[in-house]
């Protein structure tokens, strides 16, 4: 994440928090430390950036749930996984930007799309939605700026 984009995200967050908490001095606002070195960090930065620009964005959790197996006396004897009910291959972020559905798959490092994710991408694009693979924050911001100016 370059300095300009990091500062831009910080400025957006300060503006939002100044409006929400007008009596708190800027120096005392609790600001988020954004980074894009991990998938979690990049997802958080992108989601925040979209929201702070006045659009809708949400993180999609596609992971199942771990459940304890218990005997009748309540003793835990193991764990089973309940599958997620979300669509297989769903993107990490679902957003609405300029009234259009935008799905963003976050990939950091050597991560690649699974076959299910490629099928999901085809389904979204065939339906008229926008699908984007974000590898780092700077390229996402570049895409975002072009997209909102169309």
Indicate where each model-derived feature is located:
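Catalytic phosphate/metal-binding cores of nucleic-acid and nucleotide-processing enzymes, i.e., regions
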Residues: 1-150
């Amino acid at each position: 994440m370059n300095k300009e984009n990091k500062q831009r995200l910080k400025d957006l967050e300060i503006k939002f928090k100044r409006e929400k908490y007008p009596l708190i001095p800027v120096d005392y606002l609790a600001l988020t430390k954004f980074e894009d070195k991990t998938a979690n960090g990049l997802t958080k930065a992108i989601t925040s950036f979209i929201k702070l620009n006045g659009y809708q964005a949400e993180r999609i959790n596609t992971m199942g749930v771990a459940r304890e197996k218990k005997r009748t006396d309540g003793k835990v004897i193991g764990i089973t996984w309940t599958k997620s009910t979300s669509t297989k291959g769903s993107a990490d972020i679902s957003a609405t930007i300029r009234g259009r559905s935008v799905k963003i798959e976050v990939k950091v490092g050597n991560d690649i799309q699974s076959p299910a994710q490629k099928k999901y991408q085809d389904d979204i694009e065939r339906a008229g939605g926008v699908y984007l693979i974000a590898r780092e924050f700077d390229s996402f911001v570049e895409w975002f700026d072009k997209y909102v100016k169309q």
